[in-house]
Amino acid sequence: MNVILLDKIANLGNLGDQVAVKAGYARNFLLPQGKAVVANAANTEVFEARRAELEAKLAADLAVATERADKINALESVVIASKAGDEGKLFGSIGNRDIADAVTAAGVELAKSEVRLPLGALRTTGEFEVEVQVHTEVKAIVKLSVVAED
């Protein structure tokens, strides 16, 4: 099924690209989310008329994401206290939700889906740098300090 993308989508294309995708992906994800329209003559004309508006919306989203990334990078070390053993091994782990909640408590709104932990949850005390993907093109680094709870 051919669709016209209304947004930048990772591993697929940018705004205005006409791409071929599987019918289920288009019907179940792209079309309901408003990220694409079926590529036909009528939709192509409508898209060309709205192209400037959509590009302005993407630029505004990017500007907001860049501003949020600057706020996240400006944060001092975010401290998370958790119960730990004598050698600094945590009883449990610190995951995406815990990090997102701590950053939100520090004053910058952050969703758990934006936190990237490629090596999995944190299981020891110490200093960590956690990557946060605020937008498809914008990333930030959170300085995280995991300390043992009294």
UniProtKB/Swiss-Prot annotation:
Classification of source organism: Bacteria, Pseudomonadati, Pseudomonadota, Gammaproteobacteria, Alteromonadales
Function noted in UniProt: Binds to the 23S rRNA.
Q: Name one GO cellular component term.
A: ribosome
GO MF term (any one)? structural constituent of ribosome
Q: Its GO biological process terms?
A: translation
Which family is this protein grouped under?
Answer: Belongs to the bacterial ribosomal protein bL9 family.
**Protein keywords:** Ribonucleoprotein, Ribosomal protein, RNA-binding, rRNA-binding
Q: What is this protein called?
A: Large ribosomal subunit protein bL9
Q: Which gene encodes it?
A: rplI
Pfam entry (one): Ribosomal_L9_N
Report whether Ribonucleoprotein shows up as a keyword of the record. yes
